[in-house]
Regions:
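Helix-coil boundary and interhelical linker segments in multi-pass alpha-helical membrane proteins
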Residues: 13-38, 73-90, 127-149, 195-208, ...
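C-terminal ends of transmembrane helices
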Residues: 47-57, 99-113, 159-171, 222-231
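Topogenic membrane-insertion module of multi-pass membrane proteins
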Residues: 1-51, 100, 106-121
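Extended hydrophobic alpha-helices typical of membrane-associated regions
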Residues: 56-61, 183-190, 200-258
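Solvent-exposed interhelical
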Residues: 38-71, 151-198
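Hydrophobic core of alpha-helical transmembrane segments in multi-pass integral membrane proteins
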Residues: 15-21, 42-46, 68-80, 93-101, ...
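Intramembrane alpha-helical segments
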Residues: 63-138, 224-225
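Small-residue-rich segments of transmembrane alpha-helices in multi-pass membrane proteins
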Residues: 10-20, 66-76, 117-134, 179-193, ...
């Protein structure tokens, strides 16, 4: 099935870099080996994030074997890019690794620190990751592309936030408070904000197909709220959300002005 939980290990990393891949292909640039290694890096990041979250929720488990193993894999890949691309790429990828380590700590959604945690990880995985992908594959990222890539973070924040809430529900550790209530409203609607931003941004570059497809994409989070949220298990819902990011990656990849 399309929502089989194991698919998340492919879809989530794809959501980090698919826009960058499509943009590179549109510029007729593609470094196959670089992309394979970069994709493995994002797979390792996702595995590390999942492992760290479980360790944060269950502090009685041993952390060091997971920390050492995942970081050895990541640093081997960083060394590859240091040898083949540029130090600036290594520094950006290292920032993703660094922010990913915040998942070692249990951050409750009713705490102010959760806001910083979500924003930093969202920017790292959904902006920096795509930025690096474009740069590694094409060798150039224009200021126009850079600005447009940032819009995608809004969709990434939505998915990351809902995943956190689903994990809390699964673990029976739900948290409430004024910080959660205010921030929850904004992030839970960031998919809608992102679509509105798309309409406004491309007002002078009106594309009827883009408008139609972005409008249809609104059905995915709407169906999540009114139907799938009550029908699927937590793991299947997470896969559903990863599919949403892949869809949005395809739309942004093809309709970003380059």
């Amino acid at each position: 099935q399309a929502t089989t939980p194991w698919l998340s290990f492919f879809l989530a990393p794809l959501g980090y870099c698919f826009i960058g891949l499509i943009l590179a292909l549109r510029q007729q640039q593609f470094q196959f080996l670089h992309f394979v290694v970069l994709f493995l890096f994002f797979v390792a990041i996702y595995l590390q994030e999942n492992s760290y979250r479980k360790l944060a929720l269950h502090p009685e488990k041993k952390k060091w074997p997971v920390i050492v193993l995942t970081n050895v894999i990541l640093f081997v890949i960083l060394f590859y890019f240091y040898q083949t691309v540029a130090i600036r790429v290594v520094l950006l990828l290292f920032a993703i690794v660094l922010f990913n380590h915040t998942n070692l700590f249990e951050v409750k959604v009713n705490e102010v620190s959760y806001i910083y945690h979500l924003l930093l990880n969202g920017i790292a995985k959904y902006y920096i990751a795509n930025f690096v992908t474009v740069y590694v594959l094409s060798g150039n990222v224009t200021s126009a592309i850079s600005a447009q890539l940032f819009q995608y973070v809004l969709f990434g924040l939505y998915v990351s936030h809902i995943k956190t809430k689903l994990t809390e529900r699964k673990e029976g550790k739900r948290h409430f408070g004024p910080t959660a209530a205010i921030f929850n409203v904004f992030v839970s609607l960031s998919w809608l904000v992102g679509t509105v931003v798309y309409y406004l941004w491309y007002l002078n570059h009106f594309n009827i197909l883009g408008i139609i497809l972005f409008s249809l994409s609104l059905l995915i989070p709407i169906l999540y709220q009114i139907h799938f949220r009550k029908q699927y298990t937590v793991n299947r819902l997470i896969t559903y959300l990863h599919w949403y990011l892949v869809v949005m990656s395809v739309l942004y990849g093809f309709f970003i002005a380059i």
